[in-house]
Amino acid sequence: MNTSQIVVMLCFIVGVAQTALAIKEDDCEVCVKTVKRFADTLDDTTKKDYKLIETAFKKFCKTQKNKEHRFCYYLGGLEESATGILNEMSKPLSWSMPAEKVCEKLKKKDAQICDLRYEKQIDLNNVDLKKLKVRDLKKILNDWDESCDGCLEKTDFIKRIEELKPKYSRNEL
């Protein structure tokens, strides 16, 4: 093999490696979805200035819960955040970089950002509540921002969920 063939092969291998390393939405789902949702809230003026993006992100973070709230904490979007790598998100967003690429950059700075995962949703129409653990029943109520005062046993939680089910379950046709 001559030198030019080796160079071509090397370039090909590097290109394949870069494609394989590219982050996918499933690899970093909370980051990608949160960045996309946040970017969709920005107006054209804000999108061009990374300082305005940072201010808007801090305001956005005040309304977030659960995994998104943790994501904001990792980035430095909350007052109680220990570290701040907010500019690693705001500057690329101001350049109109896609969410997947932004999250790829963030992952290089802090790997735990991509460790955040959404929990699997329980399909209430097809699940037997009696087979779930009390912890899962409590989680269902917590996700609905409901409480079960006086619930001590599993049957109490099931009864409360059955009462609230029509209010929260979506019937798909």
Swiss-Prot record:
The keyword Transit peptide is assigned to this record: no
Signal peptide interval: 1-22
Cellular component, GO annotation: endoplasmic reticulum; extracellular space; synapse
Subcellular location: Secreted
Pfam families: ARMET_C, ARMET_N
Disulfide bridge partners, by residue number: C28-C114, C31-C103, C61-C72, C148-C151
InterPro entries: ARMET-like, ARMET_C, ARMET_N, EF_Hand_1_Ca_BS, SAP_dom_sf
Protein's GO biological process: dopamine metabolic process; dopaminergic neuron differentiation; neuron cellular homeostasis; neuron projection development; synaptic transmission, dopaminergic
UniProt keyword terms in alphabetical order: Developmental protein, Disulfide bond, Secreted, Signal
Family: Belongs to the ARMET family.
Biological function: Required during the maturation of the embryonic nervous system for maintenance of neuronal and cuticular connectivity. Essential for maintenance of dopaminergic neurons and dopamine levels.
Name of the protein: Mesencephalic astrocyte-derived neurotrophic factor homolog
Species whose genome carries this gene: Drosophila mojavensis
Gene: Manf
